[in-house]
């Protein structure tokens, strides 16, 4: 079940958007005991939520953001932001170097018993900027990250360097990137082996899906939940 969901710079949403299914500790909750699920001490999750707003207010784009997020788990394709999926104010022509193409997605879920996951993804027109998965076994505990990937080097080579940038789509840009990978439970030797196995970081897909294939329990459980249980669909009335 979803606890919290955040995203930024997606279609009509430029600023950070936050959505929570956590039931508030108010008298309203007590009047509707069938509208929430008690999963752990001090943790009640709403069963349903209604998103309301005027026409063209962003309701459909909110659902599209979840679909966009989910597709990288199902299709395992090249992870990057696309011009038609970032806010119009963040685009300056066709040149990704001139605009703000950084997109952020964060999903916190409860799966079963006292099993909580927090997944964070940042990407731009080059690829993944940051990706991490955290796990905790109780509400009062702190998240301990299962893995963390951070892009620590980026060199962009444009065939129009030295000339005034026109912002059109006639130039060709090549990116040279490097990442810092941290998997506490695997140790440095295994991290180095995984790093060498991924010959092209830029087009590697989500790291969590690779870790799931290697048998990491937490990466598999979260990825499986996103692919098979997260069902973002619109219901027009």
Per-range role (PLM):
Residues 2-67:
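Pre-Walker A-like glycine/lysine-rich segment at the N-terminus of P-loop NTPase domains
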Residues 4-8, 92-94, 193-195:
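Intrinsically disordered, low-complexity boundary segments flanking structured domains
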Residues 5, 10-13, 68, 105, ...:
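Aromatic side chains
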Residues 13-15, 115, 127-129:
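Short loop/turn segments at connectors of secondary-structure elements within structured domains
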